[in-house]
């Protein structure tokens, strides 16, 4: 059985882990870690201590400012993507333990497409550039 790292829990809410195959469970935001526990298999869990968090990127829908999911990027172990029942409330609870400059907005489809379109002239120029 998994042992929680938190001594106090600020928020516990139903969530979906979007890593590979999706799994449903509960997210707990506490004083020492962000924790996810699978509801079907208690041995399937993710515990991310606050000092291991590099930054958190939230996917915000354009116009509505609704947060659909967020990803926690760690210093060593890659990233973990979650969607909770109320992502905004979850990130507000996380903000208590993570600096605000580490909470960033993830680029959406239009941002990525615009950046790619702006880079086309540079790519074409580099194709015909003679190297010394």
Can you say where each PLM-predicted feature lies in the sequence?
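Generic detection of short hydrophobic beta-strand segments and adjacent strand-loop junctions
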Residues: 7, 46-48, 82
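Non-catalytic membrane-recruitment/adaptor modules and adjacent regulatory linkers
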Residues: 9-12, 80, 104-111
């Amino acid at each position: 059985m998994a042992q929680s790292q938190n001594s106090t829990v600020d928020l516990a809410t139903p969530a979906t882990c979007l890593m590979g195959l999706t799994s449903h469970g509960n997210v707990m935001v506490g004083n020492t870690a962000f924790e996810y526990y699978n509801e079907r298999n208690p041995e399937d869990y993710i515990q991310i201590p606050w000092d291991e968090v590099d930054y958190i990127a939230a996917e915000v829908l354009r116009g509505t400012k609704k947060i659909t999911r967020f990803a926690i990027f760690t210093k060593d172990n890659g990233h973990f993507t979650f969607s909770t029942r109320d992502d905004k409330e979850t990130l507000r609870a996380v903000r208590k333990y993570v600096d605000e400059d580490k909470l960033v907005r993830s680029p959406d489809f239009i941002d990525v497409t615009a950046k790619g379109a702006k880079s086309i002239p540079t790519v074409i120029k580099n194709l015909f550039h003679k190297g010394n």
